[in-house]
Amino acid sequence: MPLTVAVQMDPLEQINISGDSTFALMLSAQARGHALYHYLADALTWQDGRLYAGANRVSVQPTAGDHFRLGDFAIIDLGRDVDVVLMRQDPPFDLGYITATHLLERIKGETLVVNDPEAVRNAPEKIWVLDFARFMPPTMLTRSLGAAREFAARHGEVVIKPLHGNAGKAVFKVGRDGANLAPLIELFNATYREPHVLQAFLPEVADGDKRIVLVDGEVAGAINRRRAKGDIRSNLAAGGTAEASELTETEREICAALGPELKRRGLLFVGIDVIGGQWLTEINVTSPTGIVAIDKFNGTDTAGRIWDAIEAKIEQRRAA
């Protein structure tokens, strides 16, 4: 079933193909005979009741530095000319990102958008996770220094990070003496308009944090990410390293609790982060990563599994 696929993502020349999940999805789509278009989110245009994008046909190959070829440029109608849109631009989850979800939501009745744009907009990664607070470490969202001091006094060492941050950027640890808490709150308040996330520091992070990928609500695989020496962050984008990992009983319980809701919302490709085998910290729905490392260690084909799910959904839509 050849499909026409439009990939909304960052510039192709900027990606690191050795670990980029979007690139893996494009390679898999191409191998299945699907036609690929590439465009940037700022190429979206709404006019006369239709959503368009200025896009290029593209082919990809797993050769570093020579990994893509752009073909003809065209203005494509995302509701009529393509079968599926992959919404894969990286955060920040700002008004530009939110606006793109509003525009893509307008073609949902015509074209499958992965992940569902309305669901992405309504599930900020560090806010929606609060619906599953029973699995989370102690967490506070605040801009108040007084509230932050009370939280730190209660929990000792804490971590502070931006509410809509990504890839481990601007994540800080505050020691038991709290000496750097006030300047960090001051800096965050000057930099961000939203509340900030404070969480009790989990010593188990020394053993890494686990990225678990779910495809259409089902576990597809997991890796453990170990932090670089002298860093508190385990993100691969921040210098962490991946290793093979199995799920604990609690992690399976977390996935079982999440799965039906992910499926109901149309969140087909999701990555969750778990520390210490039991503490859920984030639910990543905007542009999840990790499938390349998962497949490397587990001998799986997660990109293929994602395309199986996409193709099944398109068949269902066509049969309806």
Question: What are these language model-derived features?
Answer:
Residues D10, D90, L163, P288:
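Flexible loop residues that form catalytic
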Residues L3, I15-S18, A228-I232, E243-A320:
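ATP-dependent carboxylate activation and anion-phosphoryl transfer catalytic cores
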Residues A43, R211, G271-D273:
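Short, surface-exposed charged micro-motifs
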Residues T4-M9, V114, V158:
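Short hydrophobic beta-strand segments
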Residues T22, L145-G146, A153-E157, H164-I254, ...:
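Phosphate-binding site of ATP-dependent enzymes
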Residues E13-L141:
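Conserved N-proximal alpha/beta basic substrate-recognition cap immediately N-terminal to
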Residues V7, L86-M87, Q199:
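Redox-cofactor binding/interface segments in oxidoreductases and associated redox assembly factors
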